[in-house]
């Protein structure tokens, strides 16, 4: 009986040592977005990272926080989510052009500004995270939007297609036809 108890304690101790580290990793020149596979340091606005069970030290990075939230809601996830980190846009020195490489906060406790008149790094509407609710309130006063927690962010804010403006891809059809004409189609 003593041996069985000692064995069980030893196994439990080993399992505790094997707990996966889910601390946020800083952005670096090799960090690319999960969806876009583009270098994240080349894009403005806040970023996100998701740590998955069984993939230690290899979080999925996202070029926009809205992409991070969208990933959480997609049914195709292959691994359980252990941690979700987003860039605190209220951190000292954080700007839209340079949101910071290591000012990560727990996405589950952040305050988000949703519906602000500002675009994220991929040119789509962004949900903007803050550790301090007062900083979120000040941002919303300047840029519009509503303040809410992660679970309250509506799917329409992160899963709906982005609408193009007149100055965006308004001539997409014309350019596509020109390519078809050149290709003999």
Predicted regions and their residues:
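Bacterial signal peptide processing site
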Residues: 14-17
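Short cysteine-rich clusters marking metal-coordination/redox-active sites
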Residues: 33
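C-terminal partner/receptor-binding element of secreted or periplasmic proteins
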Residues: 131-135, 139-185
């Amino acid at each position: 009986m003593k041996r069985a108890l000692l064995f069980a304690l030893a196994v439990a101790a080993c399992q505790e040592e094997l707990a996966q580290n889910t601390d946020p990793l800083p952005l670096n020149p090799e960090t690319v977005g999960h969806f876009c596979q583009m270098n994240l340091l080349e894009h403005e606005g806040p970023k996100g990272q998701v740590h998955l069970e069984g993939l230690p030290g290899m979080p999925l990075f996202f070029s926009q926080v809205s992409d991070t939230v969208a990933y959480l809601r997609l049914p195709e996830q292959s691994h359980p989510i252990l941690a979700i980190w987003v860039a605190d846009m209220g951190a000292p020195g954080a700007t839209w052009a340079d949101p910071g490489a290591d000012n990560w906060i727990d996405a589950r406790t952040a305050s988000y500004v949703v519906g602000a008149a500002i675009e994220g790094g991929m040119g789509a509407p962004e949900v903007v995270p803050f550790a301090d609710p007062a900083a979120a309130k000040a941002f919303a006063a300047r840029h519009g939007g509503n303040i809410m927690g992660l679970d309250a962010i509506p799917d329409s804010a992160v899963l709906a297609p982005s609408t193009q403006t007149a100055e965006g891809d308004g001539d997409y059809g014309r350019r596509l036809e020109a390519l078809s004409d050149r290709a003999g189609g």
